[in-house]
Amino acid sequence: MRRGTIVSMLLVGLVLLGSEKAVHAESDGLSPAERAAVDHLLTTTRSVRKRLDLTRPLDPKLIEQAIEIAVQAPTGSNAQEWHFLVVTDAAKKAAIADLYRKGADQYRTMPRPDYGSDDPRHKQQARIAASGAHLYQHLHEVPAIVFVAIDGRVEKEPPAAQAAKYGSVLPAAWSFMLALRARGVGAAWTTLALIHERELAKLLDIPDSITVAVMLPVAYYTGSDFRPAKRLPPAGRTYWNTWGSRRNLTGAASHAAVHVR
């Protein structure tokens, strides 16, 4: 599949909008073509590590375009307190990579989940470990490393304030990843370098009043065969009205819930 195919698929709904607008004039939803393009983007945008193209220069304008999209994300009280720090300097990328590796080494010593052999996560562990090892070795080679941050600190805040703070920056970071993907650019969602956040802040002159939420190594990706990941069935973790209650499907029109333990 050619690289342009993905972008074409994502844009096909907009191209067809003019011809289908009359048909869907009374609906608040997207047309089938638009919905298919959006669903494809949402279900196939992956954290890219092994397939980041380390040799191809990255146009800064693509990052800026993706940020323009990202800041349309929800923000509590319309505060818009997010910040995007783009690092392309080779020496700084090398220093960031050192902090990332130090954080990764610490992470490896932490207790790991023990998934059962029939759990899809068990089968995915080796592949994810290999992907992480590749980024561990090559992080300093990516064209750009982007940090998404927000004003304020959360360490001493109550749960509601912490939720509000992260809820006002993480949607923008995810939108940034989606916008990059639509432009043929990949990113890896990682927080391991933040184990040493204060050292990172000193390296990049980040004020003490700022919280860094995520680090995103960014590069063009190779190939175009991204597909949905194997996930646990969401029905097992979807509740209605009360935690642990699932929707009763015995009646065609029933929305009652049954409690499941």
Go through the PLM ranges and name each one.
Residues 12, 22-23:
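Cleavable N-terminal signal peptides
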Residues 8-16:
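Bacterial N-terminal signal peptides
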Residues 105-116, 204-228:
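A glycine-rich helix N-cap at a beta->alpha junction
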Residues 65-71, 144-148, 152-203:
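Small-aliphatic-rich amphipathic alpha-helix that forms the alpha element of a beta-alpha
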Residues 1-8:
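Bacterial N-terminal signal peptides that target proteins for export
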Residues 86-167:
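Glycine/small-residue-rich phosphate/adenosyl-binding loop
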Residues 25-30, 44, 50, 211-261:
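C-terminal helix-cap and adjacent tail motif
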Residues 23-57, 61-65:
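Short acidic N-proximal helix/loop "leader" segments that mark the beginning
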